[in-house]
Structure formats: structure tokens, C-alpha cells
């Protein structure tokens, strides 16, 4: 939508309702929005809300090799559209199979968790963390990560870096 010489799009990086505004003079636009009562968010705040809401980000949580069924982003796939790169494997999984891991949100009883930390259940490695951040709202670290399907159910208990964690 055109607005005051800019383009406004309903896009959310956090999983909450949001907008992206594209324009030539970002400083002037920011000043107008702040004078109208808008409160700017830092990149760190946006990242925290994104992870708290389980919203994956390409490059952090979704990769070139990720399958839509793993990332739980099926709303982004059309099974009625013509050919596209990767269609055969995506359709084969939908029609006959399943994935072995899924991207899930976790809350971890630890102050700091790094990307790449291993997720463990019953003494065996069952996944890894892709994004993690301390959540002031929950008082825990919230994280996104790929976890093997048997441990993906909400409420499943796992460990990350030796700390207790729960899948949501």
C-alpha cells in the first residue's frame, strides 16, 4: 500500500502483527512515526519476540537444505502449483512419508544457550538448537531447534547443555 511516498506491507518478523515500511528517507519517516506514538524496537528485541513466538528465520533456523515439513511452514507451500525446484521430494514426503526431525520451540532452564547446542533425551542426542535468547517474559532461555520426531510433542522433556528443557 502506498503511504506518504512510501510502501507499507503487512509483514511480520516476529509472529505478531506487524508492518514493514519501505521508503527513501528512513530518518524522516522514523521521526513521523515516533511523533505519532510509535515505539521503535531494537534488533535484539525483535529477535527475542521472534524466538518467543516460535517464528523461524531463514539463515538462522531455515536453511537451503531444510524441508517445509521439517520447518513446519506448510502454509508457504502449494501442492496445486506447477513445477518448482524441490517439488518432487516435498510431494513424496507429503504423499508417502514423514520427516525424521522438526523445528520446535523450547524453554530451557539455563541463562545462556548457544546456537548449535545439542538437544539430548534419555542420554542420546536428538537434535540441536538453531536460535536461542534469554526471555524476560518467561524468565528462561527460549530457543528454536530441530528435534527428532519422537521428542517433538509439546511437553516433551529434553536437556540442552545439561539444563532441563521443555518442548512447546
Language-model region placement:
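Intrinsically disordered, low-complexity regions
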Residues: 6, 16-19, 24, 60, ...
Amino acid at each position: 500500500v502506498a503511504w506518504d511516498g512510501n510502501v507499507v506491507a503487512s509483514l511480520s518478523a516476529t509472529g505478531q502483527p506487524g508492518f514493514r515500511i519501505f521508503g527513501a528517507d528512513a530518518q524522516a519517516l522514523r521521526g513521523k512515526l515516533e511523533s505519532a506514538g510509535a515505539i521503535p524496537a531494537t534488533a535484539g528485541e525483535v529477535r527475542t519476540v521472534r524466538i518467543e513466538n516460535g517464528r523461524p528465520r531463514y539463515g538462522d533456523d531455515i536453511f537451503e537444505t531444510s524441508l517445509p515439513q521439517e520447518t513446519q511452514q506448510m502454509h508457504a507451500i502449494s501442492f496445486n502449483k506447477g513445477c518448482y525446484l524441490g517439488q518432487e521430494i516435498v510431494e513424496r514426503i507429503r504423499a508417502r512419508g514423514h520427516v525424521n526431525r522438526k523445528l520446535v520451540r523450547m524453554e530451557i532452564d539455563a541463562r545462556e544457550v548457544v546456537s548449535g547446542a545439542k538437544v539430548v533425551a534419555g542420554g542420546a542426542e536428538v537434535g540441536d538448537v538453531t536460535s536461542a535468547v534469554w526471555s524476560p517474559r518467561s524468565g528462561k532461555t527460549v530457543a528454536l531447534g530441530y528435534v527428532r520426531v519422537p521428542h517433538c510433542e509439546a511437553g516433551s522433556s529434553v536437556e540442552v547443555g545439561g539444563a532441563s528443557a521443555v518442548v512447546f
